[in-house]
């Protein structure tokens, strides 16, 4: 490659886990770094202005007006914009804040006195004004690609970067987590549902069929089914597959097969749309 690809990275309403996942490539980074020029990455260096970029990876969605402004500026200055990680693609865990108004959130967070919080709301000069809801990047600007995952596995990051360097479109897994899960499935509907801490699951059998609230059947593959393999139900962090419009609706339809028992599940919003509420068909609490 004659010219290096000018790469930008930023963390908005996210935890920097996607950046760490990129670093988790370790020595593999040495294969791609010669073809990249990192021109903007606040997590690495303090650069005041966003420069022109060939590719920009945005981690996190928008929770405040400053986030939204930066997303628009990045779009204007970048040839290729990638929503990087589930928070950017779907809203992620912060998106559960959409179940409450911005004022309710501020009152709870800053209005509850603690040992290091005097119960005063910060001014807009200290904290940028919150948007009415958490917004995924694709709901604000057009993006060329999305890379879901909380965080994306290092090999998915590597595959996307190599594809772009070679002039190809990055590809995402088409299957669901259940397809990667080694547990035995007998296609039975559980008679009742249990919390994760209740009982000890059979290490060989499907967690959902044992009554644990696993959502692997409605979640895009790519993680290698790490959680179910370790005895922890899938929580849906890779979001929906290409076959459905809404992860939560798809999962609710699956769980409905259990009849009234499914209605007894606590906090269904956080089960079915734990990582994807801002991108759901009903993306926030209806007044």
UniProtKB/Swiss-Prot annotation:
Ranges in a coiled coil: none
Q: Which SUPFAM superfamilies match?
A: HydA/Nqo6-like
Q: Which UniProt keywords apply?
A: Oxidoreductase
Q: Which cysteines are joined by disulfide bonds?
A: none
The EC number(s) this enzyme carries: 1.12.99.-
What GO molecular functions are on record for this protein? iron-sulfur cluster binding; oxidoreductase activity
Note the Gene3D superfamilies from the entry.
NADH:ubiquinone oxidoreductase-like, 20kDa subunit (3.40.50.700)
Lineage: superkingdom: Archaea
Listed under subunit, the entry gives: The F420-non-reducing hydrogenase vhu is composed of four subunits; VhuA, VhuD, VhuG and VhuU.
What does the similarity note say?
Belongs to the [NiFe]/[NiFeSe] hydrogenase small subunit family.
Q: What is this protein called?
A: F420-non-reducing hydrogenase vhu subunit G
Q: Which organism is it from?
A: Methanococcus voltae
